[in-house]
UniProtKB/Swiss-Prot annotation:
The keyword Mitochondrion does not apply. It is an enzyme of class 2 (transferase). It catalyses: RNA(n) + a ribonucleoside 5'-triphosphate = RNA(n+1) + diphosphate. This is DNA-directed RNA polymerase subunit omega. Promotes RNA polymerase assembly. Latches the N- and C-terminal regions of the beta' subunit thereby facilitating its interaction with the beta and alpha subunits. Keywords: DNA-directed RNA polymerase, Nucleotidyltransferase, Transcription, Transferase. Pfam families: RNA_pol_Rpb6 (PF01192). Its EC number is 2.7.7.6. The RNAP catalytic core consists of 2 alpha, 1 beta, 1 beta' and 1 omega subunit. When a sigma factor is associated with the core the holoenzyme is formed, which can initiate transcription.
């Protein structure tokens, strides 16, 4: 994979907005010192995070997806 595009990731993520949130969250984790899932490369964290999404190794948690859609049913403090 020479370049990672949105189209490479969209089959694995519901929509472009969710992809942006997922990629940004993973990039922040990598910058904070999280271990990369893929082999070490000279890619910057945002590119590496999209590569991880494109391979299907990074996915949205169901609770996050429901919270973003406004349908979260978890135990929320009242």
């Amino acid at each position: 994979m020479a370049r990672v595009t949105v189209e490479d990731c969209l089959p694995l993520v519901d929509n472009r907005f969710a992809l942006v949130l997922l990629g940004a969250k993973r990039a922040r984790q990598l910058m904070a010192g999280a271990r990369p899932i893929l082999e070490q490369s000279k890619n910057k964290p945002p590119v590496l995070s999209l590569r991880e999404v494109a391979t299907g190794r990074v996915k949205f948690d169901r609770d996050v997806r429901e919270a973003l859609s406004g349908k979260y049913t978890g135990d929320e403090p009242k």
